[in-house]
From Swiss-Prot:
Enzyme Commission code(s) on record: 2.1.1.-
GO molecular function, one term: methyltransferase activity
Pathway(s) where this gene product acts: Secondary metabolite biosynthesis
Lineage start: Eukaryota, Fungi, Dikarya, Ascomycota, Pezizomycotina
Organism of origin: Aspergillus fumigatus (strain ATCC MYA-4609 / CBS 101355 / FGSC A1100 / Af293) (Neosartorya fumigata)
Name by which UniProt lists this protein: Methyltransferase psoC
Name of the coding gene: psoC
């Protein structure tokens, strides 16, 4: 996924942060405001919560805004440049989830969250990353993973269908495979208990609520150009011309017909 990261950098951090905020609002609506799906008792104050791949902490701030009691929030990202200048009570630290976690955070967290980042585990794949995440948990703590299902997506128009096919071929080519559908079993293999899975349909464009029409399109279409750049480096059924045309096709289809993606949320608890 180095091509994806490099192209995202070239496009600039601010557009990517705006896209992530748009996507967060879209997911928040699909989840009916319940961003913490794992059954962690958030009514009890002082929970320690880590968002890995946090960017500017949008998910953490959104979670915090919904709570009636205080918790301790931490955000990590391989790109420390994305962290906000004002941390606003959130602890940020630069870290790649491929690397061993800092000693002070081992056995420290009640919840460790990742959303939309596990493709970055290539070429080794998510299994060692997930195993690594379990070292961060207190006894009784939870890991929650949320990723897009590109391999068995909901019915859509031809452009969104091609988008899912392109993504599935790209995930296969970089070595992560059908990880969204396999995260549940990987949590089990990592030794977690009470492992569960929730699937959520996210409406986009014309199928979204009117107030989320533009945001949902922006959130999903933003990464297509960088993703197609990765797709060019692996075995693909698409020609270069078809990959060039895909971003505009998806945007037009979402604006005129709408579309859907399925997000798979897998979560498990440390004994």
């Amino acid at each position: 996924m180095d091509n994806f990261m490099e192209m995202t950098k070239k496009l600039g951090h601010q557009p990517e942060l705006l896209r992530l905020r748009a996507l967060d609002a879209t997911y928040d609506d699909a989840l009916e405001g319940k961003l913490v799906v794992a059954p962690l008792d958030m009514s009890e104050p002082g929970k320690k919560i880590l968002d890995s791949g946090t960017a500017d902490g949008t998910w953490l701030r959104n979670v915090r805004s919904k709570q009636s009691v205080p918790h301790d929030y931490y955000g990590s990202d391989v790109e420390g440049e994305l962290f906000p200048k004002d941390p606003d009570g959130i602890t940020y630290f630069a870290h790649s989830f491929k690397d061993p976690w800092p000693q002070q955070y081992l056995g420290f967290f009640d919840l460790v969250h990742i959303r939309g980042s596990l493709a970055g585990s290539a070429p080794e794949g998510p299994a060692p990353v997930i195993q690594n995440l379990t070292t961060l948990l207190k006894p009784g703590g939870w890991v929650q993973l949320m990723e897009m299902n590109a391999f068995s997506p909901p019915p859509n128009g031809p452009a969104m269908t091609d988008f899912a096919k392109m993504a599935s071929e790209m995930f296969t080519g970089i070595g992560v495979g059908d990880f969204a559908n396999n995260n549940k079993s990987m949590l089990e293999d990592a030794g977690l208990k009470n492992v569960q899975e929730k699937r959520v349909i996210v409406n986009l464009g014309k199928k979204a609520k009117p107030e989320l029409h533009d945001q949902s399109i922006h959130g999903v279409t933003g990464p297509i150009v960088p993703l197609t750049s990765v797709a060019r480096t692996v075995k693909s059924s698409f020609t270069g011309e078809q990959l060039d045309a895909l971003p505009a096709r998806v945007k037009e289809e979402l604006e005129t017909e709408g579309g859907q993606v399925e997000m798979i949320i897998a979560f498990g608890q440390k004994a």
